[in-house]
Amino acid sequence: MKKRMMIATTAAFMAWWILVCIPASALAQAATPADSVKDAAAAADDATDSMLPHFGDARPFYVSGQINVIFQTHPAFHADYSGQNSFGPHYEKATSRIMTLYTGVRVSHSTEVLLDIEDAAGQGMSNSLGLAGYSNLDVVRIPGEGSPLSTAPYLARAMLHQVIRLSSRNAESDRGYMTTFAELPARRIEIRAGLLDTVDVFDQNSVGSDSHFQFMNWSTAQNGAYDYAADTRGYTWGVVTEYHDGRYAFRAGEMLEPKIANGIDMEWNLRKAHAENFEFEVRTKLLPKKEGVVRLLSYINHANMGIYRDAVANFKAGLTPLPEITDHPQQLTVKYGFGVNIEQALPANLRAFARWGWNNGKTESWAYTEIDSTFVVGIRADGRQWHRKKDRAGAAFASNAISKDHQNYLHDGGLGFLIGDGGPGFLRPSGNLNYGREQDMEYYYTAHLWRGLYAGPDLQHVNNPGYNRDRGPILIPGFRIHMEL
């Protein structure tokens, strides 16, 4: 039944697109018969990369969309024991599907409104639990078993984007879900206010930030130690200001936090919860004649977060039957962290990236995942090397860790919102955690099949799932189909 609903919804989405977009595109082409050679070439490239025609760059509006389907499975693996939030040791398979409609309208030469509608269906293996670096980034949008989230389409982004010109010179800009502008001032201030994904702006990386074409693992596609403000689906309300000046950029954002860890309801009272995010970016050449980017990230979260050490102390004092991170009075605690994000062009159409992240690890994991420190390194190869210019292949290694306080909490049977091999009825005299760093290796290939249709395999190998040496390793093969509409 669920599969039939997914197919029906997908078909309806594509039918709507054809009815709305193709006539409008035809009208746009008829109204501008004197398109330049450059515009015609760009239109040809666009037709190659998308399933359906798009409006020209000169149009003050933007309409696009995407469909991303990920299938994953894993064979049975060794596990000395399992708990309430464990990744299941028996054979599993699961499919997720995300569809997004991107829209934008330019209301002046410097102001635009962007609005996206999204629909999510399917599921993740083991109800999307048991791995700190979970294998499918798309499942953050999908209601799990027992989730209060609606299965209906939802508003994903709704933001006002204001550009303040500081120079007469322009720079090219890619029209997309974050802007309708084909050009922006080379030196400028940008202000975004509304509903967005924090990592739409912060911790971006052209090699490892897109589960539609690149890596799927949570700790590879994003900085796992960046516990950025977000609701259950990964979105939040906030204001972001950016300053761009050629090689340099600086951005700062004030975001709403959820009322509870990984919750859908946001706390609008800033005296009870809020998050500050800062990032400095410099474009440099770490290698001669090869462009690179270095981004330095910091963030501070203020929310009603529990403290691991207090939860363990209450358990050992007999005040709770097991460590319970949510068993505390209303309080305002602080989590802070830092990150480094590097990408570098290499010879032979290769591009490498690396991330390092750390947070203080004293308070409960709140909005993204249960990682307190991380290191990731990866590489992408462009298909030009084998005469498939639109194809991509990549490999990455991620090593994730948690603080000692976090380890003690899980060892004594405590549960986070994602991991924990303990829980009620699962407590073991010797403890529920034989700690080891969770390590993920991922390989993918994305083949361009036709116009906006892409597909390819993915393979992940996970050591110490949920930071537990008593479980795993796990082999997770997968397959992705993606359509740019």
Region locations from a protein language model:
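Outer-membrane beta-barrel "beta-signal"
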Residues: 156-169, 473-485
